[in-house]
């Protein structure tokens, strides 16, 4: 543990941020699984929204958000193409 007060505070802040980030990433992963299984347009929109929010707050990189959105769109498009 840190010996300096500022370092102790920094440690607490990092712990809190890590906990938040972990929760957000878990929710994104669960939404991706749901989208891949259902391939519903509403689920894809939720992936878009969640990925954009996380990228905006630097919880994930902007490139990762773009990649995830692209994958979700491909899953949705392949489902609509298969149903034709």
From Swiss-Prot:
Residues 75-84 have a biased composition (Polar residues). Residues 62-72 have a biased composition (Basic residues). The keyword Ribosomal protein applies. One of its GO terms (molecular function) is structural constituent of ribosome. Residues 62-84 are annotated as: Disordered. The keyword RNA-binding applies. GO terms for cellular component: ribonucleoprotein complex; ribosome. Belongs to the bacterial ribosomal protein bS20 family. This is Small ribosomal subunit protein bS20. It comes from Mycoplasmoides gallisepticum (strain R(low / passage 15 / clone 2)) (Mycoplasma gallisepticum). The gene is rpsT.
């Amino acid at each position: 543990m840190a010996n300096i007060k500022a370092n102790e505070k920094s440690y607490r802040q990092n712990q809190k941020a890590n906990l938040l980030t972990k929760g957000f990433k878990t929710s994104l992963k669960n939404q991706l699984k749901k989208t891949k299984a259902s391939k519903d347009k509403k689920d894809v929109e939720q992936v878009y929204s969640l990925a954009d929010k996380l990228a905006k707050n630097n919880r994930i990189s902007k490139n990762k958000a773009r990649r995830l959105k692209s994958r979700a769109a491909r899953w949705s498009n392949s489902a609509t193409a298969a149903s034709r």
